[in-house]
């Protein structure tokens, strides 16, 4: 929603917010916009449809008036929704709806090796890992500890020195998973100590085992529709969303509050809320990055869990990079990810119901 507002200049909302989500006693979503209380719109555009599960999509359809035009936008080669279903893929595969494939690239130039590599990955072909004269690099490394050290060096020293990137706002490490030496948990510890080390006078707070330090890069890990924010121009509102990233600008220990700058908004968390909703974001999972884009992306590809070693995950990570992409690890892992088109094994019934509806 944030990115769409930036690009279009129009208000954009998450589907949950559009449908005015509430929560039942079991913390399940309940949408107050539905067939009895429909939306008031003539045309609705839904972006990133590959991330929308079957339940949310059904709820959206129930809330639309029959006169509304629905335009669906998404990349069927990216990661499927976390929840059940393969909505975008099934709608396309049914052949019942007018479909247009967009081929012109706006994030990079057509000559970009990032673009060429993304196309090859989608086609099940290995990207060119030998070139070192473009925006896509592969740095071979067999040892997880040395790979972690290399990633930390890239993010804290080499890329800022060579390209002028900010270690906090421009460079993003994307990991297949959270666990292991090259998962987000361990890498965040190493990256934080290199990029934002402790110092005399630099405020810190430890809450429920979570460490927060002034200057830390953090990510909102769940939607919070009631969290207030304010801008310098006096504009105020509510709502911070899953995947939003920011930097800690103040830690008020006496007041038990943490201030985070998310884009041009100042968001104040009490300590309890921060420990439940914020995580370090020097490294995040590819899943959490979906829908975002970054000037420079570094991806470890050395020892991901087998269940995360598949094509759509690699493709999604690669396509988050706008200007520079670096893969660190083993060529064999990249081969395995490109060859494994596991997404085809997600079993759903939407296509069948569409084609057999009486």
Region annotations inferred by a language model:
Residues 123, 231-235, 242-358:
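C-terminal accessory regions
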Residues 52, 79, 226-227, 304-307:
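Short beta-strands and strand-coil junctions in structured, solvent-facing domains, enriched
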Residues 76-239, 249:
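Conserved helicase motor core of P-loop NTPases
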Residues 65, 213-214, 241, 289:
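Residue-level recognition of short, solvent-exposed, well-ordered loop/turn junctions
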Residues 2-7, 15-30, 35-142, 216, ...:
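Conserved helicase motor core of SF1/SF2 NTP-dependent helicases
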Residues 1-9, 180, 273-275:
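Conserved helicase NTPase catalytic core signature
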């Amino acid at each position: 929603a944030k990115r769409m507002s930036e690009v279009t200049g129009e208000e954009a909302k998450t589907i949950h917010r559009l449908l005015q989500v509430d929560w039942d006693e079991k913390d399940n979503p309940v949408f107050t916009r539905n067939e009895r209380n429909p939306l008031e719109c003539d045309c609705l555009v839904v972006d990133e449809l590959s991330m929308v599960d079957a339940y949310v999509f059904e709820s959206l359809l129930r809330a639309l008036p029959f006169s509304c035009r629905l335009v669906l936008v998404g990349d069927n080669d990216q990661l499927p929704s976390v929840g059940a279903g393969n909505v975008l893929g099934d709608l396309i595969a049914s052949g019942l709806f007018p479909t247009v494939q967009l081929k012109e690239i706006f994030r990079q130039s057509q000559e970009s090796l990032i673009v060429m590599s993304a196309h090859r990955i989608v086609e099940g072909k290995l990207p060119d890992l030998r070139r070192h004269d473009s925006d896509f690099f592969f740095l071979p490394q067999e040892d997880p500890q040395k790979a972690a050290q290399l990633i930390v060096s890239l993010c804290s020293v080499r890329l800022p020195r060579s390209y002028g990137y900010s270690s906090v706002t421009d460079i993003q490490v994307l990991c297949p998973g959270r666990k292991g030496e090259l998962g987000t948990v361990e890498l965040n510890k190493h990256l934080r100590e290199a990029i934002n080390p402790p110092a005399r006078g630099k405020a810190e707070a430890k809450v429920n085992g979570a460490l927060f330090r002034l200057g830390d890069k953090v990510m909102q890990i769940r939607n919070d529709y009631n969290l207030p924010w304010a801008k310098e121009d006096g504009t105020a509102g509510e709502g911070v969303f899953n995947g939003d990233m920011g930097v800690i600008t103040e830690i008020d220990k006496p007041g038990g509050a943490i201030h985070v700058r998310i884009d041009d908004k100042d968001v104040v968390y009490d300590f309890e809320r921060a420990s439940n909703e914020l995580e370090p974001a020097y490294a995040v999972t590819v899943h959490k990055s979906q829908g975002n884009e970054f000037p420079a992306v570094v991806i470890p590809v050395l020892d991901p869990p087998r269940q995360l070693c598949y094509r759509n995950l690699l493709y999604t990570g690669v396509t988050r990079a706008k200007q520079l992409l670096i893969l660190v690890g083993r060529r064999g892992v990249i081969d395995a990810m490109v060859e494994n088109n596991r997404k085809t094994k997600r079993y759903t019934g939407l296509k069948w119901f569409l084609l057999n509806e009486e």
